[in-house]
């Protein structure tokens, strides 16, 4: 929304060097708000104010077609699939980006309170799997995306859907990566958790950054590449959860490199 919260987030993104050219500021609707309660161990509980939020009101005609046609990776979550018109806008953006050669990256980022019920969440979360190239799931999200809570079986299900690069994060257990008929485990970096907010985003940001730098298509990525990408993701997440907040906790690339080389 074009309100104090929306303007704050736009400015924060720009300070971080993020291109906001495709951002749409709705003058009539409020920015959705997320509140995070932390346990002593740094685990989170979410609540939202969103009735409706400006994010759910994004219309297909507001999409920046030039940006979509010139992107290398189009990243999407399931939050924009919870309501119309953002659901239709998400689909149009996905089809446009995919048809012009972008790799489609997907982090369901399941938030129970944003869905009418689990069945609706499952239907929508799984609906876009056939056009996804890269996916990151947490253990908690496996039943919604793959219909099973077993890592090996979930990977098989996602392979059958045609997903080329699969990542399942396991918290302190690190991550499992898979491509083709191969899979590997990648250990986490030890750390004292202060706040796990943003850990998944930090991991996938590090992973996707390395994927883009590789210059490879999703079909040329080897299992060794996947391990390398995931190590960067694990290092990024480790630094993130050692700090408080969703945005201030994000580390720099220099910090990640130092941890990887330490």
Label for each model-derived stretch:
Residues 73, 79-157, 163, 173-174:
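Conserved beta-alpha-beta core of the PfkB/ribokinase-like small-molecule kinase fold
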Residues 95-96, 147-262:
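Conserved phosphate-binding/catalytic region of the ribokinase-like
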Residues 1-78, 257-262:
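Conserved N-terminal subdomain of the carbohydrate kinase-like
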Residues 52-61, 114-120, 148, 218:
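Short gly/ser/thr-rich secondary-structure transition/capping motifs
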Residues 12-15, 39-42, 121-125, 153-155, ...:
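Short, hinge-like loop/turn segments at secondary-structure boundaries
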Residues 26, 77, 138, 169, ...:
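Conserved residues at the C-terminal ends of beta-strands
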Residues 32, 78-82, 237, 243-246:
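Glycine-rich phosphate/pyrophosphate-binding beta-alpha loops
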Residues 18, 102, 246:
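Short glycine/serine/threonine/alanine-rich loop segments
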